[in-house]
Design a protein with these regions (language model features):
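N-terminal export signals
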Residues: 1-12
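Short, low-complexity, disordered segments immediately C-terminal to signal peptides
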Residues: 10-23
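Metallo-beta-lactamase
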Residues: 24-27, 31-32, 63-65, 71-72, 113, 118-158, 162-227, ...
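Divalent metal-coordination and catalytic microenvironments
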Residues: 35, 58, 68, 83, ...
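Binuclear metal-ion centers of metallo-dependent hydrolases, dominated by the metallo-beta-lactamase
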Residues: 228-249
Length: 249
């Protein structure tokens, strides 16, 4: 995989370890496979310090498509500048995978330049309940739908009740978002809006629907293969064994 860092880290040719960063880290763009990139943005969290969040840039027949914005407005502006330099145009749309800031924190930026937002009604409703603006909204009305050249699939609740995953068939890349944990994860992370009783079943639906996936991209952390799904289920099993009432047992 190749990596591009915007602004200062592009000039230095390297990325400082997260623990050494003082100012907000620059956006990073990592090539996964031909036509698919992972964008990585950061937010400072009290418990973990500077914490990375993943989204995708997918080259489609209509032009570049974003899966989730960057975490902040400024990093989303950086993301749009990267796309503009690469394709000499703005993205044709942004698919939002759930209604947390690490997925839609830059929607005001994308909306201000006319980029269409694709999300399910459930995600849109949740965003509105949180008083988040959703500009240029196009509602995804079915559990499985094609958006440009990608498939958006709602497998059931997990990290949130309304999280979706995105399948890039030609590249065999599945973007699991925060439904899927990275191999380095040792816990479930933020479960404030989780539906713990259905999460494992939702992971199983993703595994059955996309058995040929070569790359799995979690919401946070490094991509891997479909072993990420097994790892997520194992984390759920461990957590639920200690909190049985929270998991519907």
């Amino acid at each position: 995989m190749t990596t591009a860092c915007i602004s200062a880290c592009a000039r230095s040719g390297r990325v400082a370890p997260v623990s050494q960063r003082v100012s907000t880290p620059s956006l990073e763009v990592h090539k996964i496979v031909a036509g698919v990139w992972r964008h990585v943005s950061y937010q400072h969290l009290k418990k973990w310090g500077w914490f990375p969040s993943n989204g995708l840039i997918v080259e489609t027949s209509a032009g570049p498509l974003l899966v989730d914005t960057a975490w902040t407005t400024e990093q989303t502006r950086e993301l749009l500048r990267w796309v503009q330099r690469r394709w000499n145009r703005l993205p044709v749309g942004v698919v939002v995978t759930h209604a947390h800031d690490d997925r839609l924190g830059g929607l005001q930026v994308t909306g201000s330049v006319g980029i269409t937002t694709y999300m399910t009604k459930a995600v849109a409703d949740q965003a509105h309940k949180q008083n988040k603006s959703v500009p240029r909204l196009h509602i995804i009305s079915t559990p499985v739908v094609q958006v440009r050249d990608v498939e958006v699939f709602y497998p059931g609740g997990g990290h949130t009740a309304n999280n979706v995953v995105v399948w890039v068939r030609r590249a065999r890349v599945i973007f699991g978002g925060c439904l899927v944990k990275s191999a380095a994860s040792r816990g479930l992370g933020n479960i404030a809006d989780a539906t713990l009783e259905t999460w494992s079943a939702s992971i199983s639906k993703v595994a059955r629907r996309y058995p040929t996936a070569r790359y799995g991209v979690p919401g946070h952390g490094s991509p891997a293969d479909l072993a990420l799904l097994d790892h997520t289920r194992a984390l759920l099993t461990s957590w639920c064994s200690r909190h049985r009432s929270r998991c519907g047992h």
